Amino acid sequence: MTVKTRFAPSPTGYLHVGGARTALYSWLFAKNQGGEFVLRIEDTDLERNSQEAVDAIIEGMHWMGMEWDEGPYYQSKRFDRYNEVVDQLLAEDKAYKCYASKELLDEIRAEQEANKEMARYDANHPKIVAANAAAKEGDACVIRFRNPKEGSVVFDDQIRGRIEISNSQLDDLIIRRTDGAPTYNFVVVVDDWDMGITQVIRGEDHINNTPRQINIYEALGAPVPMFAHCAMILGDDGAKLSKRHGAVSVMQYRDEGYLPNALNNYLVRLGWSHGDQEIFSQEEMINLFSLSAVSKSASAFNTDKLLWLNNHYIKSSEPEYVAKYLQWHLDQKEISLDNGPAITEVIKLVGERCNTLIELADQSRYFYQDFEEFEAGAAKKHLRGVAKGPLELALAKVEALEEWTTENLHNVIEEVCAELEIGMGKIGMPLRVAVTGGGQSPSVDAVMQLVGKERVVARIKMALAFIAEREANA
């Protein structure tokens, strides 16, 4: 039997961190088992759904690299199938029409609470029996599933172990509303049955739904999938993860400069572990992932840890991979790569210093765009009269260079130091400010090599003009 998992988000918002981790676990399990992964959009709530949310979910899945084998399927296009199964259950007396109004049910619930009874639907309540008896053909009604009254529902959760719920705790679930819309707990059963889903991996907030769904599977004679319920993700303060803890949408992490491999690595470790290993390639995640290694306990989201992972992936990934995701940020900042070095060379040089792709884009700018002024603090400290002689000598030497290599540029700096009998900082820092516009960069000889001879010469001249003006105004 082919293992088949699914991710089934509701398009009422963006793909959030909790949903992304659930999708990742489902995707990894399917890949680990040589199975298939299905994407299904649960869009039966027509009032709250939006195409924008659907697009955001699909964009987030693509960005994270979780491609699906089937789908996306849309529940809103399957109403005929749901009605067909409702009719089957009605014909087999496994479902029935209920004419009790919402007002009547609210009244009964208030009485139960006043009498300190468990508030629940009871088909045999005299007022409900009377409402059904008084109904006429064509009156508004819901369809309820006839839940077993005896026994228990038992299932082996692949994360939490054996779970047992008495049927006496479950009431007769509405499977179709008065407006004809099918309900969540019903349609997911029909979908998972039709789509051959073998493992349902989802959040622990669905545990209470599982026994209700299992009873529907059994009433339909459908195979019951295995279930695995993941613990929730908390903020680093122990509260439920929310916007105040930082980004909660997957695409917000894209916007903030994270690599998908870093986010995937971080999310997989929010609940799953393999010894003390922290860094996992996608191939390792697929090969090592198992539900038995997923913790029952909630995990705390730590942005500092994610930032550390992002820096690791920026500096250790192939430059071509980083460049693929950096391009979006370069576009946002209107940095064109048409006039400058290969971006992969810039990534090799600058990437190690950057925690995010936003930082990397910012630190790439001076390789491709000229600046009109120097950073004030750096210029005040390093572009002074004392730097004039070293910069003039360096300018003459770089203009005379026939081979523009990092080694030759390093030799130029050493020659300036030797001829003027100055320390490296007396020329290195003024050159850095002149060439980059600021006081921080990788090794200045390597930076100069990538910036290119024409720009380096022009920028040293600009720095000398700045010093001359500063002296004139002193």
UniProtKB/Swiss-Prot annotation:
Q: Where is this motif: 'KMSKS' region?
A: 240-244
Q: Does the keyword Nucleotide-binding apply?
A: yes
A Pfam family reported for this protein in Swiss-Prot or TrEMBL: tRNA-synt_1c
Record's subcellular location: Cytoplasm
Its UniProt entry gives the catalysed reaction(s) as: tRNA(Glu) + L-glutamate + ATP = L-glutamyl-tRNA(Glu) + AMP + diphosphate
Which GO biological process categories is it annotated with? Answer: glutamyl-tRNA aminoacylation
User: What is a GO molecular function of this protein?
Assistant: glutamate-tRNA ligase activity
Q: Where is the motif 'HIGH' region annotated in this sequence?
A: 9-19
Keywords on this record?
A: Aminoacyl-tRNA synthetase, ATP-binding, Cytoplasm, Ligase, Nucleotide-binding, Protein biosynthesis
Q: Where does ATP bind?
A: K243
Fetch the PROSITE patterns from UniProt. Answer: AA_TRNA_LIGASE_I
Known CDD domains for this protein? GluRS_core (cd00808)
Q: What is its EC number?
A: 6.1.1.17
- Can you quote a single GO CC term? cytosol
Top enzyme class: ligase
Primary location group: cytoplasm
Tell me how this protein assembles.
Monomer.
NCBIfam families of this UniProt entry?
Answer: gltX_bact
Tell me its family: Belongs to the class-I aminoacyl-tRNA synthetase family. Glutamate--tRNA ligase type 1 subfamily.
Free-text function comment from the UniProt entry: Catalyzes the attachment of glutamate to tRNA(Glu) in a two-step reaction: glutamate is first activated by ATP to form Glu-AMP and then transferred to the acceptor end of tRNA(Glu).
UniProt protein name = Glutamate--tRNA ligase
Species annotation: Aliivibrio fischeri (strain ATCC 700601 / ES114) (Vibrio fischeri)
